[in-house]
Design a protein with these regions (language model features):
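Conserved ATP-utilizing enzyme core subdomain
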Residues: 75-167, 236, 249-264
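A glycine-rich, Thr/Ser-enriched phosphate-binding loop motif common to dinucleotide/cofactor-binding enzymes
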Residues: 31-41, 158-169
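Catalytic-loop motifs flanking and including active-site residues across diverse enzymes
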Residues: 8, 39, 81-86, 162, ...
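Generic structural signal for well-ordered alpha-helical scaffold segments
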Residues: 43-48, 147, 164-175, 231
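Alpha-helical scaffold segments in soluble metabolic enzymes
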Residues: 11, 15, 41-45, 88, ...
Length: 264
């Protein structure tokens, strides 16, 4: 397995004059892990509760969950698409970068035949730990699923079904992994009020909100996670990613690229 990380840390360190830590995923992969998800390392550090089950749900292009159970158990994995398919579809038909508050999707209706086709994706049945990305869930994947239908739904109904797909895959994973508890969303999808409401309806008895309610800006949590990982590496601390990526042992993630001043 191989992961290509964009951005050259040598150039970043040289031009900014700041010691840079980068390329976190490949060390995890070298230790037998999948290289993702890594943000759960911070989730367990700052979001766990000793007396409540909690889940942190990061909805970026891909959605992932971190289960932080009160008994100390930790599980994290990618559930499937987050915003990626909805963003692709609305960009194609409306020229927008994203469906603000899920408004376009809300005006449509879920097509059950199309939803069933989406839910037949084999990745969804794999056991954790598992990770995925745009190499699977992309425009070509969506076209293949649509091509299997006898009749295409309207573009707006497709958008409604894609929102339901994200909500269903997330809620299914959460219900299977956690009995009751609190669910906090972060990432760009946390701003999609229609998606947040739909997840709440699919999970009666659970509290559903955003990480802002536990003191963390939903837009900053992933950046915070990598800053925290960088500090662990600078301090010479190995981190245990085994519950999340399947790595065989704790490792120090990323390489250190000194600033020009510290290197001289």
């Amino acid at each position: 397995p191989f992961s290509l990380q964009l951005g050259d840390p040598n150039t970043i360190a040289e031009r900014t004059g700041i010691t840079t830590v980068a390329d976190f995923r490949r060390r995890d992969m070298a230790a037998g892990g999948q290289g993702a998800p890594l943000a759960p390392l911070l989730h367990q550090h700052c979001c766990a509760s000793p007396n409540k089950n909690r889940a942190i749900v990061n909805i970026g292009g891909i959605a992932n969950i971190t289960l932080l159970l009160a008994n100390g158990a930790r599980v994290a994995f990618d559930t499937g698409p987050g915003n990626v398919l909805m963003d692709l579809w609305i960009a194609r038909h409306n020229g927008a970068r994203f469906d603000k508050n899920g408004e376009w999707a809300t005006g449509g209706s879920v097509d059950t035949a199309f939803l069933a086709e989406l839910m037949s994706e084999p990745y969804l049945a794999l056991a954790a730990p598992k990770s995925t990305g745009r190499e699977l869930f992309n425009g070509a994947w969506l076209e293949q699923r649509l091509a299997s239908l006898k009749q295409w739904p309207s573009p707006q109904n497709i958008q409604a079904t894609l929102l339901e797909f994200t909500a269903t895959t997330l809620s299914t994973a959460l219900l299977a992994g956690m009995r009751q508890g609190e669910i906090y969303l972060c990432g760009g999808g946390a701003h999609n009020t229609a998606l947040l409401k739909r997840i709440g309806k699919l999970m009666p008895g659970y509290y559903v909100g955003t990480t802002a309610e536990i003191g963390i800006d939903p837009d900053w949590l992933e950046a915070m996670a990598f800053a925290w990982m960088a500090q662990q590496t600078l301090d010479g601390i190995a981190v245990d990613t085994s519950p999340f990526t399947g790595a065989k042992k704790p490792v120090m993630l990323g390489g250190i690229y000194p600033s020009p001043t510290s290197a001289s």
